[in-house]
Amino acid sequence: MSVEAEELACREGHMGVLTLNSPGTLNALSEHMIEQIQDILDRWANDDRICIVVIQGAGERAFCAGGDIRELYDAILDGQEPEKPVRFFSREYRMDYNIHRFPKPVLGIAHGVVMGGGLGVFSGCRYRLVTPDVTLAMPEITIGLFPDVGASWFLKRLPGRLGLFMGLTGARLNVSDTLRVGLADMAILPEDRDRLLDRLASERWTGQTAADDNRLFRLLNQIQTPDYRTLPPSHLARHEPVSYTHLTLPTNREV
């Protein structure tokens, strides 16, 4: 099974933990995985026992490397499913939209590779935690595609037109870059992830969205975070003055 769904009893209420579990493909999203995620979210949205949701990735290397391009390529090449690309992207975009609009607090915990469709999933989470080894990117331009999965919304919100920079270059951001531009809310050490889940399970969740969201917000602000001085230096910070000058030019050709 490439997506795992656990329903954990808390001190009061339940917590849904959704784990992308295909480490061999860096948890890349196949069409089947997208269908699984959507089914799980639909079930939890309508289950009064589930008060909060956590989304994470299995394995040591990635939260999610994006859509399973190999699956799409093979489907197109053999000609057996000409409708698959349209169906795949339609389902993926709908899933991303539903994460953004999920009626209960959603916490994303990302490590390692977070690219393309993985960033689409992560950006939809209400709260976004990253580990120091995280690498974020929207690399679609390198395969002749465009930044999708809601990127026209979340890239446009980045400061200094850095969303344009990410979209045009496919540049990779490290943990300090990610926090600097607001694509994540805070950092967490890998060894603290399980402790955080234990802490969440010890809470009293009410099933009232506003109250549970407030409780989760306060809890996250109480957890221990890495000393930010020990994190890798921001690549973007070194180049921001020059890049901003170019990114404000009126056309992409001039940029």
Question: How should these model regions be labeled?
Answer:
Residues L196-D198, G207-Y228:
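Globin-like tetrapyrrole-binding proteins
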Residues C125-P147, G182-L197, V255:
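Gly/Pro- and small hydrophobic-enriched strand-loop and loop-to-helix capping segments
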Residues I99-I143, F165-M166, G170-A171, V175:
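Glycine-rich beta-to-alpha active-site loop
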